[in-house]
């Protein structure tokens, strides 16, 4: 059966972050690579993988291992903490590559996009399937840039566990906090890997303390480093009281020695380990009642007698309950500590059956899967990543998309191995699959075996009754999709000629399916296409992909900030629409009120006055509310979306025979009339900012931020550096990378994340409106 497997290659894409290293590592790496012999990025698959590029070993495990032996995990961290390097080492030690990929050399397996290999960053999360000591591990390497936060959100939605990678010299950094919060939201158990223990300034104790203080987590120290920075040579296994020393003569780190600690040879290290183990036992006993009963009953006199397997089982339960996080350490770049990390993944992180999914009881074993990522391949069309929660997927079978109420036929079923894919005959619950043939499916869609299966699940859930505005009964069994953040930047994009506009539209359509955080709009005034994205890097990567993958040399307009608008007072308005079309009269009159919402809200909240009965609402409520929301997409000042607004419909008169289109047009005009009469306010995106800078450059950095309307909240000390925390308007921080590099001689880094939208001062608002010349733009 295995001889019939086939390998395919696809191009892929990702999402981003505004964390910028002012040392311009991407340019340094690009220059270094220019001096080397260039290796083509694309691989030939006329022969089995392993013949060209990174050699890949065929999967030897069974196609569908027991669910208890599956681990769906993600690698998450701040940029440059070593996520991709750690992943490459995992692939190598598990036997799926025969050479070590390196980010600096641009030959990694999971960073397979041209932009990733040139920049030395991860943009798009690459899924990799591998085996380790009888376990199937589905591994996803995620980006650390804030511009690509959606990519992290996508993979966390379908994971059962995660590995958080930290730079041991920096501890918890800005993006670490972001991805940690995302993991908390999805209740994902995780373990921590303190990477770069060989780096100058690495401090195990500092990193552990930052996890405790900044993440408010309870670290369980499972390993101790043997040496730090240049003296780092291995780790101590606290649970088993053993030391692991990597052979200095081994270049690839495969050879290491595991020895029990003894009083004779390691008295000091043994003492530290015993103390750490006793402390670990006490910590776990406080968090796990079963283990506490065992320790107090059988081993109260001597903790040394507590069996390692009992302690490991308790740590597994504590990790699953998210009461604490196991902490390990090593250096992926120096090939030390990665094999024990893989052991910890299989020992402490949960299997799919250990995660609670309440909706599974509705399906009774029928197929239920979530589409969490869509890619586009020029030969095979859309490629959809699915997490299978229940049932079995088979190729050449029809499946039902609950969100889009359509049935599609899946032609092929693949196991993902970065840009290499292995075709398989079936895949069961707990696995991550890649499918070919689902042309309508988008990110966040729920996939079931048939429409009748979805309706049966809805009835079991007790929510099968039709409700006003409900599209279908099956909506009650939709899985929670992936939250799409609002873009903060936009710019126009033009093709090289009008004849190429259809080609550009085609490219943008594909890119939007792959990356839902990319929004494409049409400016009604100029007719230009507008790109809306998560940051400067996001827009830059999209522009680059259009050129590389679709052969279009497009032109970008100036990058602009995506503002919002709101109102400051309550206003009533009335609008009448009276038209004769053919021999039919269409008449509608609406009266409504707009006012500031009591609570912040991204979209308008809609209410109906008591005088508006169901008999007056001859048009469906859904159409009425869509008209109100549509009217709030373009504010009267800048054409920006309106937020923090409440709308109350007071009356609606409709002549018999009036079309729904005329009614909604009347309501939409009435909302716009009310918004124009109200006192208006522009809201600007406010970013949370973290700047890491050496002491000597702190003063000029603070002075520069003050000129940018920055609000400094705190200045922390991190090793020999200062960390400036604060808020700054996004409009003031554009191009900050170049300025900071100049101020600090390229030694500082900074990270940005959208915090909220704040009201602009009257003077700043007047300046902005003057710059925009009063012309509205579609965001």
UniProtKB/Swiss-Prot annotation:
Residue numbers binding GTP: 77-84, 141-145, 195-198
Statement: the UniProt record of this protein carries the keyword Transmembrane helix: no
Location(s) in or outside the cell: Mitochondrion
Domain tr-type G: 68-353
Catalytically driven reaction(s): GTP + H2O = GDP + phosphate + H(+)
Keywords from the named record: GTP-binding, Hydrolase, Mitochondrion, Nucleotide-binding, Protein biosynthesis
GO molecular function annotations of the record: GTP binding; GTPase activity
Location (main, coarse): mitochondrion
Record function comment: Mitochondrial GTPase that mediates the disassembly of ribosomes from messenger RNA at the termination of mitochondrial protein biosynthesis. Acts in collaboration with MRRF. GTP hydrolysis follows the ribosome disassembly and probably occurs on the ribosome large subunit. Not involved in the GTP-dependent ribosomal translocation step during translation elongation.
Note: This protein may be expected to contain an N-terminal transit peptide but none has been predicted.
Name of the protein in question: Ribosome-releasing factor 2, mitochondrial
The organism of origin for this protein: Rattus norvegicus
Gene coding for it: Gfm2
């Amino acid at each position: 059966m295995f001889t019939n497997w086939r390998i395919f290659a696809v191009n892929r894409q990702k999402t981003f972050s505004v964390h910028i290293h002012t040392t311009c590592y991407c340019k340094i790496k690009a220059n270094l690579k220019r001096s080397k012999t260039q290796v083509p990025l694309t691989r030939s698959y006329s022969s089995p993988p392993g013949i060209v590029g990174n050699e890949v070993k065929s999967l030897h495990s069974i196609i569908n291992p027991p669910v208890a032996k599956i681990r769906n995990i993600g690698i998450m961290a701040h940029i440059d903490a070593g996520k991709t390097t750690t992943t490459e080492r995992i692939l190598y030690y598990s036997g799926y590559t025969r050479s070590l990929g390196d980010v600096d050399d641009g030959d990694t397996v999971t960073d397979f996009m041209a932009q990733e290999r040139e920049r030395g960053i991860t943009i798009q999360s690459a899924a990799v399937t591998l085996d380790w000591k009888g376990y199937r591990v589905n591994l996803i390497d995620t980006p650390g840039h804030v511009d690509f936060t959606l990519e992290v959100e996508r993979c966390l939605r379908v994971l059962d566990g995660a590995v958080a990678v930290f730079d041991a010299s920096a501890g918890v950094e800005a993006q670490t906090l972001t991805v940690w919060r995302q993991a908390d939201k999805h209740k994902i158990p995780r373990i921590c890997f303190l990477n770069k223990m060989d780096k100058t300034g690495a401090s195990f104790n500092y990193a552990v303390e930052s996890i405790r203080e900044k993440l408010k987590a309870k670290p369980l120290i499972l390993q101790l480093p043997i040496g730090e920075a240049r003296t780092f040579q291995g780790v101590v296994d606290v649970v088993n009281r053993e030391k692991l020393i990597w052979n200095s003569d081994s270049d690839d780190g495969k050879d290491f020695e595991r020895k029990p600690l003894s009083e004779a040879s390691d008295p000091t290290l043994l003492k530290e380990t015993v103390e750490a183990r006793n402390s670990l036992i006490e910590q776990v006993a406080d968090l796990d009642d079963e283990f506490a009963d065992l320790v107090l009953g059988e081993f109260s006199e001597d903790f040394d007698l507590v069996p390692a397997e009992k302690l490991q089982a308790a740590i597994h339960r504590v990790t699953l309950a998210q009461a604490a996080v196991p902490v390990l350490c090593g250096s992926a770049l120096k090939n030390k500590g990665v094999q024990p990390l893989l052991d910890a993944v299989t020992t402490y992180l949960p299997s799919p059956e250990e995660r609670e999914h309440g909706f599974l009881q509705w399906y009774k074993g029928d197929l239920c899967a979530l589409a969490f990522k869509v890619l586009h391949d020029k030969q095979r069309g859309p490629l959809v990543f699915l997490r299978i929660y229940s049932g079995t997927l088979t190729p050449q079978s029809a499946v039902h998309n609950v969100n889009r109420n359509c049935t599609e036929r899946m032609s092929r079923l693949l196991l993902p191995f970065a840009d290499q894919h292995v075709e398989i005959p079936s895949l069961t619950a707990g696995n991550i699959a890649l499918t070919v043939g689902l042309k309508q499916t988008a990110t966040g869609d729920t996939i079931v075996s048939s429409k009748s299966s979805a309706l049966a699940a809805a009835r079991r859930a007790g929510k099968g009754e039709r409700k006003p505005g409900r599209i279908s009964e099956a909506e009650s069994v939709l899985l929670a999709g992936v939250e799409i953040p609002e873009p903060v930047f936009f710019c126009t994009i033009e093709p090289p000629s009008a004849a190429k506009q259809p080609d550009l539209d085609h490219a943008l359509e594909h890119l939007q399916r792959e990356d839902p955080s990319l929004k494409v709009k049409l400016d009604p005034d100029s007719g230009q296409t507008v790109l809306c994205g998560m940051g400067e890097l996001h827009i830059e990567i999209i522009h680059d992909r259009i050129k590389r993958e679709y052969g279009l040399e497009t032109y970008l307009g100036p990058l602009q900030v995506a503002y919002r608008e709101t109102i400051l007072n309550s206003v009533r308005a009335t609008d009448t629409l009276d038209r004769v079309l053919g021999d039919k009269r269409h008449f509608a009159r609406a009266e409504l009120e707009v006012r500031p919402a009591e609570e912040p809200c991204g979209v308008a909240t809609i209410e109906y006055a008591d005088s508006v009965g169901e008999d007056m609402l001859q048009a469906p409520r859904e159409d009425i509310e869509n008209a109100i929301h549509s009217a709030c997409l373009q504010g009267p000042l800048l054409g920006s979306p309106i937020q923090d607004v409440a709308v109350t419909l007071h009356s609606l008169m409709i002549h018999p025979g009036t079309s729904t289109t005329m009614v909604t047009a009347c309501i939409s005009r009435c909302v716009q009339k009310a918004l124009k009469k109200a006192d208006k306010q522009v809201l600007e995106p406010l970013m949370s900012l973290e700047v890491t800078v050496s002491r000597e450059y702190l003063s000029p950095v603070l002075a520069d931020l003050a000129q940018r309307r920055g609000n400094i909240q705190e200045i922390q000390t991190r090793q020999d550096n200062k960390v400036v925390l604060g808020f700054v308007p996004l409009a003031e921080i554009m191009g900050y990378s170049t300025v900071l590099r100049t101020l600090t001689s390229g030694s500082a880094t900074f990270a940005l994340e959208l915090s909220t939208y704040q009201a602009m001062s009257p003077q700043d608002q007047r300046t902005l409106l003057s710059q925009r010349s009063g012309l509205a733009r579609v965001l």
